[in-house]
Amino acid sequence: MARVTVEDAVDAIGNRFDLILVAARRARQIAVGGKRPLVDPENDKPTVIALREIELGLVDSSSMDVIDREEQQHQEAAELAAVAAIVGGNQ
């Protein structure tokens, strides 16, 4: 298991409070959201993987916002397509 120094991750994000928010958000994406890790998992838990990604500069607050926006747009497009299919099927 790789050791992650939180200090390096804090330096990458700016402060420890934002680090907690970004790391928790990314760990949730990996654990529950089915997102692939950007680094080799090496049998690490999602929280450690998230911290390693942050430490390497692969993930930050703004990149998380972009990912969330893209996912929301994709979900909305899928919902609109489903509604269009239902409406089109009823005519």
From Swiss-Prot:
InterPro entries: DNA-dir_RNA_pol_omega, Pol_omega/Rpo6/RPB6, RPB6/omega-like_sf. One of its GO terms (molecular function) is DNA binding. It catalyses: RNA(n) + a ribonucleoside 5'-triphosphate = RNA(n+1) + diphosphate. It comes from the Bacteria. Its EC number is 2.7.7.6. The keyword Transferase applies. GO terms for cellular component: DNA-directed RNA polymerase complex. One of its GO terms (biological process) is DNA-templated transcription. Keywords: DNA-directed RNA polymerase, Nucleotidyltransferase, Transcription, Transferase. Signal peptide: none annotated. The RNAP catalytic core consists of 2 alpha, 1 beta, 1 beta' and 1 omega subunit. When a sigma factor is associated with the core the holoenzyme is formed, which can initiate transcription. Promotes RNA polymerase assembly. Latches the N- and C-terminal regions of the beta' subunit thereby facilitating its interaction with the beta and alpha subunits. Belongs to the RNA polymerase subunit omega family. This is DNA-directed RNA polymerase subunit omega. The gene is rpoZ.
